[in-house]
């Protein structure tokens, strides 16, 4: 095929996907909300200095939201607005990094299983079946309990809990793509396996994988918040949203805003990723739309 025609077809496909996505109002709402949250995380130091979130002021303990403290203060007199703004970095970093790690590791394993099959595929998938038999939250708890509660171990635990689903998804998509005639043609011309996988298999399998990864970020953020809430994730005084909820438990009746505000932030962030993921799914394959 002429390179110019091939380039035109790719551009046309991209424009069609973008058009479908832009027509989806809920997806656009999710995208706007997500961009707003990402902008807050990126510009956190410009919006409010981090020091305001760690300075303790005993005189201003449990101050309700007002003009001086937009979100009020906590039990140590720390500015909750500053802690929420800078906490967005923790939650987004955990959600995005764990999803990308699971995608890279799970994508590599799943691609090899789907492309080669055989004994390697059987052995890996039986191991993944064992991991999937354990609920993701319990698996994460077990890993954190074994390694210790901190940010690094939380990332490891959530990535491991996400791996089985990623491996199975990538494997199933790669098996479907690998059965196409152009893959057999590439093999018959003596193409190396790595080149075939990277040039033909991966690009044609990216649609479902991108959608799944986008939507998994929301699950990862919720998992991290849940583990931090029970003291098995990010530890205080780090302002991760789940850790903020954990700190607020003891004073939930005296200062309920300490629970409501981080909870709403977690909800809106997870919702934005889910809406964008749904929109991408419908744009990439309109047949999947309900």
Label each region the model flagged:
Residues 89-105, 140, 194-226, 273:
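Transmembrane alpha-helices
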Residues 1-107, 111, 118-119, 133, ...:
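Gly/Trp-centered helix-boundary motif
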Residues 70, 74, 80, 104-108, ...:
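Generic hydrophobic transmembrane alpha-helix motif, especially the helices
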Residues 144-146, 158, 173-174, 222-265:
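Glycine-rich helix-loop "coupling/hinge" segments at transmembrane-helix boundaries
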Residues 44-52, 114-118, 143-149, 161, ...:
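Short helix-capping/hinge motifs at transmembrane helix termini and TM-loop junctions
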Residues 89, 131, 135, 144-148, ...:
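Residue-level hotspots within pore-lining transmembrane alpha-helices
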Residues 83-85, 92, 127, 134, ...:
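Short hydrophobic alpha-helical segments within the ABC transporter permease transmembrane module
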